Amino acid sequence: MRTIIEGGDDCEVDPTRVAMPTMIATHQSNLRMYCDMAWTKIITSSSFFPSELQSVFSCFRGRCEEEQKADLSENLISASIFLRFLCPAILSPSLFNLCQEFPTDRAARNLTLIAKTIQTLANFSKYVHLLLHLKNSTFFIYYFK
């Protein structure tokens, strides 16, 4: 979070919000880099996942399997973890004691774009309505092969 908040990079990929459209490719590259960083941090921190939540989600998975809906359990568990815990922490790191200061407007927008992308991955979705402008980009293809 600190790298994103303190860095001066721009991840804006919405053409209506970019003053110089020629910079969109650079912004996409920045967004991909920060999403990769966030994803790596999430994956490498799995050992810190609370055992109580592991138990709850294990029971949930078992119930889904009993109902012949095992494939649904992964989507629901992933969406729940990211929607309720991880993406809110990305969006508002100061509320989760991940940083002390409030981010600048640019950093807040970068965090929003990162959280939206990560949530989309967690939902196993093809795209988010607000990120439709990424649909044909190499960034989009990179994540949603």
Task: State the predicted function of each range.
Residues 1-145:
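Extended alpha-helical scaffold/tether regions of large eukaryotic proteins
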